[in-house]
Amino acid sequence: MDLNIKSLAGQEAGSLGVAEGVFAADYNEALIHQVVVAYMAGARQGTKAQKTRSEVSGGGAKPWRQKGTGRARAGTIRSPIFRKGGVTFAAKPKSYKQKVNRKMYSGAVKSILSELLRLGRMTIVEELKLETPKTREFKSVIDSLGVKDVLFVVGVEEFSENLYLSSRNLKNVAVCDSVEINPVSLVCFENVVLTKKAIKEIEEKLV
């Protein structure tokens, strides 16, 4: 299938043949949801930690004798019922990672890309290159393309410090290379702009 290419000025600049297996896949909302949830769960640190009664310091001596005081029996002042005692159900470090195999992951990315294309939220440009790190220049490119809340995806060799510096101060705008795209970044932005080289690299990875 052929897709139209735009120049950075927003003008038609030819067409590009793309793989239907990547950009014309069926929309699978359940798969996308599962992969996105798994991806975000894997990003959690899970470093919460509290101490149980066996881990807090102190409490070696019996606070008072077993019988005759009229008080409830106690064996240590580090019991959870005492101040400075251990936590009853202490939180421990935990991994939230969920297993997602390669076929599911690539299927979700294909489904998202195809749906973005069907909804008219995908734009393809010849290349994305800035000679100087100027936010004003990058903003003019965005305005010319008529997009907002946008993710720019470029080829690995096309990604440069100028692109990063020019875009980092713009709200709801991000730039990444084709290796860094993931289901979460694709669904978080309303629009996506890809260069020709980025499309070829994505196809090589997903086909």
Swiss-Prot record:
InterPro entries: Ribosomal_uL4, Ribosomal_uL4-like, Ribosomal_uL4_dom_sf. This is Large ribosomal subunit protein uL4. Pfam families: Ribosomal_L4 (PF00573). Residues 48-70 are annotated as: Disordered. It comes from the Bacteria. Gene3D superfamilies: 3.40.1370.10. Belongs to the universal ribosomal protein uL4 family. GO terms for molecular function: rRNA binding; structural constituent of ribosome. Part of the 50S ribosomal subunit. GO terms for cellular component: ribonucleoprotein complex; ribosome. It comes from Francisella tularensis subsp. mediasiatica (strain FSC147).
